[in-house]
Design a protein with these regions (language model features):
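Glycine-rich flavin
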Residues: 32-130
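Short alpha-helical functional segments enriched in proximate histidine and acidic residues
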Residues: 22-30, 118
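Short low-complexity stretches enriched in small and charged residues
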Residues: 10-14, 51-54
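A short, structure-level motif marking secondary-structure boundaries and short turns
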Residues: 4-5, 16, 28-31, 60
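A non-catalytic, amphipathic alpha-helix used as a structural packing/dimerization or gating element
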Residues: 11-25
Length: 130
């Protein structure tokens, strides 16, 4: 077993920089507008999906990192961009986590991808507790 380390790998640093650029160039300039509009920021989520930041593939890759650091680094950079827009981009993960934690393999395979849709047909996962 490898020794625990908080040092980021070259791949993790590349992901961090990639997301930071998206947050700086797309999220920060748009944050106030979407906050003022009080609407869901579909264009921002669509931009995230176009570059591969919003989608099941990104989440699966980030969550399968053995060091456990890729997803927290990604989330930190997204939320550096803006917390509200970050929730719009990362929010489907809550529904996906509920399904993954409690669903059968068949349910997971059917429903988790539907929490995200595709870059051309974006979907949102919703989480309800009663």
């Amino acid at each position: 077993m490898a020794e625990f380390s908080l040092h980021l790998t070259d791949d993790q640093l590349q992901i961090k920089d990639w997301i930071h650029e998206f947050a700086k160039d797309v999220m920060r300039p748009a944050a106030q507008e979407w906050d003022d509009r009080e609407e869901f920021p579909w264009p921002i989520v669509q931009e995230a999906a176009k570059i591969g930041l919003y989608g099941i593939e990104f989440m699966m890759n980030a969550m399968s990192d053995a060091s456990g650091l890729t997803l927290p680094v990604a989330i930190e950079e997204i939320f550096w961009g803006d917390a509200g827009l970050g929730m719009a981009i990362m929010g489907s993960g809550l529904a996906a986590a509920g399904i993954t934690g409690n669903g059968t393999p068949e349910q997971i395979m059917e429903w988790v991808p539907q929490c995200y849709g595709t870059a051309d047909d974006i979907k949102l996962g919703a989480f309800c507790v009663s």
